[in-house]
Design a protein with these regions (language model features):
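Intrinsic disorder/low-complexity detector
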Residues: 1-42, 46, 55-57, 66-123, ...
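Short solvent-exposed loop/turn micro-motifs enriched in small/polar/acidic residues
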Residues: 48-50, 107, 136-139
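Short, structured motif recognition centered on aromatic/hydrophobic residues
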Residues: 53-68, 123-125, 144, 152-157
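Well-ordered beta-strand positions
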Residues: 56-60, 115-117, 136-137, 145-147
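Residues that cap or initiate secondary-structure elements
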Residues: 63, 73-75, 131-133, 161
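Extended, Lys/Arg-enriched charged tracts that mediate electrostatic binding to polyanionic substrates
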Residues: 125-131
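Mixed-charge, glycine-accented linear interaction segment located at domain edges/termini
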Residues: 132-167
């Protein structure tokens, strides 16, 4: 199952990202600092990996406003993890089949692979088997890979703070 999005152009300065670790559960939350709302559904898109991992997209006003890693997949540390240099700015809108402004919840089962740099400050989640065609910057430290059909194929979290106690 795939998550297809629509891209809205963004000309403003990219939003800052607020990272928060839950030390009891190791849940990492990355939220856009801006609170601009638009019309559309609010809720979550839950991406369930075949290994039991969970990544959740926070949707407010139809737009992706954050990422939560609820259950971590095995993270493969790479000696060199290259962040895409050729990105475009945009807002990602999750189309809603429900009523305008309603609460939406979708669950998608997919292959979920996590890679990081050696310091674990850059983390890349790959979704499904498709290939990405472009990368959209939705916030200062969140990038999203899309394929040619605007299906989400990856999520980048940049400048991730260390887990408390691992510093």
């Amino acid at each position: 199952v795939n998550v297809t999005v629509q891209i809205e152009p963004a000309t403003d300065i990219p939003s800052a990202v607020e990272y928060r670790w839950d030390t009891d559960t190791a849940i990492l939350t990355a939220s856009l600092a801006d609170s601009a709302y638009a019309d559309g559904a609010s809720g979550s898109v839950e991406l369930a990996g075949s290994d039991g991992s969970w990544v959740i997209l926070d949707v407010r006003g139809g737009r992706i406003h954050g990422v939560e890693v609820a259950v971590w997949p095995d993270v493969k540390k790479l000696s060199a993890l290259r962040v895409p240099a050729d990105t475009s700015r945009g807002r990602l809108v999750v189309p809603s089949a429900g009523s305008k402004g309603g609460v939406a919840m979708m669950q998608m089962d997919t292959t979920l692979i996590a890679e990081s740099d050696q310091s674990e400050q850059t983390i890349h989640f790959r979704l499904g088997a498709g290939r990405h065609a472009r990368t959209v910057c939705i916030a200062r430290d969140i990038l999203v890979d899309l394929d040619e059909s605007d299906i989400i194929r990856g999520i980048w979290l940049l400048n991730v703070p260390p887990f408390p106690g691992d510093e």
